Amino acid sequence: MWRGRAGALLRVWGFWPTGVPRRRPLSCDAASQAGSNYPRCWNCGGPWGPGREDRFFCPQCRALQAPDPTRDYFSLMDCNRSFRVDTAKLQHRYQQLQRLVHPDFFSQRSQTEKDFSEKHSTLVNDAYKTLLAPLSRGLYLLKLHGIEIPERTDYEMDRQFLIEIMEINEKLAEAESEAAMKEIESIVKAKQKEFTDNVSSAFEQDDFEEAKEILTKMRYFSNIEEKIKLKKIPL
């Protein structure tokens, strides 16, 4: 106890034992620099501090901020970076974000905030659509791992697969009845379900080459799905 009191007296009188390091008080400049690494609000200049991921508005002046260019779609939509996505949760997050950043809510705000709301809304729409569909979600996940599939490529597809695609396309071209169309739709739907299950397993095992091959096949069948939709539209 005496040593504690003695130490307190030494601190009050301005003395300190030789060889014992003293804590230097944080200067005003140092204190201000502590937040200099954080992004600052374009409107008031205030620092955001940690936890920016969930902030769209400045905590000081409540001005809408610019979208974070480093944030990926999974983070934005509050999803794990995985091929398996809870689509109900994804839709809820989409609606939540649009209630925050949709341009309709910024008609009376500054032009800067109007521009930011347009960018946010577009980004949220793109993220939602990309993560909702298995094919676009898989391609995006591959891209995050540094792998991209060119738009027009056979990606060394085996001959048997290409023959299968050709035969389905021929059946579609010749289909004249509703029953024939439904049969082709059923085949394509079953194939896409099989591919979706397989690519999910490939991602879980970090087998990106396998995922790349399956996604390429999914893209072929996605093209057939689009042709089916077009053929259903009455001319």
Swiss-Prot record:
GO terms for molecular function: ATPase activator activity; identical protein binding; metal ion binding; protein-folding chaperone binding. InterPro entries: HscB, HscB_4_cys, HscB_C_sf, HscB_oligo_C, J_dom_sf. Pathway: Cofactor biosynthesis; iron-sulfur cluster biosynthesis. One of its GO terms (cellular component) is cytosol. It is linked to Anemia, sideroblastic, 5: A form of sideroblastic anemia, a bone marrow disorder defined by the presence of pathologic iron deposits in erythroblast mitochondria. Sideroblastic anemia is characterized by anemia of varying severity, hypochromic peripheral erythrocytes, systemic iron overload secondary to chronic ineffective erythropoiesis, and the presence of bone marrow ringed sideroblasts. Sideroblasts are characterized by iron-loaded mitochondria clustered around the nucleus. SIDBA5 inheritance is autosomal recessive. Belongs to the HscB family. This is Iron-sulfur cluster co-chaperone protein HscB. The gene is HSCB.
